[in-house]
């Protein structure tokens, strides 16, 4: 695991802003649905517990819910179609969970879960640069992510990420000075 990945993994755990699932836990292909059924402590585990059916088609995990669990839009009637969740693979790589089509409302809060498709995309880019990109392009849609009953506001999320970015910048500066 590279230093950047280690820092980013710590960020995932500390901020509770993103989902962390190992490759061994989520499986692949048709095994993914069953793998998620036994993850009670993860967001997708909670999601599966509240879904009527789970199925896989290629790299897409389809989750179908019913009743009053699912809300088509947020309280201000804006759909969460551009949300992005991240995970850490066993080998230190990253994957993105995108296409969050629908939010689920519970206890008056919005949970970023989906009865649509979750697309698992391997990420092969630098961790620090990705965090910077996430802050710049996703700040408007990162309204807070529910993982263990906690909603993290965009302000709190940015505070956590900014602290880690500052650390990365200091590490880069020290490395540059050491090379000089």
Label each PLM-derived region with a short phrase:
Residues 1-102, 164-180:
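A surface-exposed partner-binding patch
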Residues 1-5, 36, 53, 120-124, ...:
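Intrinsic-disorder-associated interaction segments
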Residues 14, 24, 70, 101, ...:
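A generic structural signal for solvent-exposed, polar alpha-helical segments
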Residues 64-67, 106, 130, 147-154, ...:
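Solvent-exposed, non-transmembrane amphipathic alpha-helical segments
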Residues 81, 107-109, 153-157:
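Glycine-rich, flexible loop segments associated with nucleotide phosphate handling
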Residues 106-144:
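Compact, glycine/acidic-enriched structural inserts
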Residues 141-180:
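Acidic, proline/glycine-rich low-complexity IDRs
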């Amino acid at each position: 695991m590279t230093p950047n990945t280690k820092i980013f993994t710590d960020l995932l755990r500390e901020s509770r802003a993103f989902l962390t699932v190992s490759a061994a836990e989520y499986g692949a292909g048709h095994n993914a649905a069953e793998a998620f059924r036994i993850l009670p402590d993860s967001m997708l585990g909670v999601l599966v517990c509240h879904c009527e059916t789970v199925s896989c088609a290629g790299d897409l995990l389809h989750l179908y819910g019913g009743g009053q669990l699912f809300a088509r839009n947020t309280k201000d009637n804006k759909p969460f179609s551009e949300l992005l969740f991240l995970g850490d693979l066993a080998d230190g790589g990253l994957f993105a969970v995108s296409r969050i089509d629908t939010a689920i409302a519970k206890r008056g809060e919005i949970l970023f879960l989906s009865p649509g498709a979750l697309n698992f995309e391997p990420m092969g880019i630098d961790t620090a640069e990705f965090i910077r990109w996430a802050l710049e392009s996703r700040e408007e849609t990162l309204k807070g992510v529910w993982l263990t009953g906690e909603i993290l506001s965009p302000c709190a999320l940015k505070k956590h990420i900014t602290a880690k970015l500052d650390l990365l910048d200091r590490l880069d500066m020290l490395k540059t000075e050491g090379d000089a």
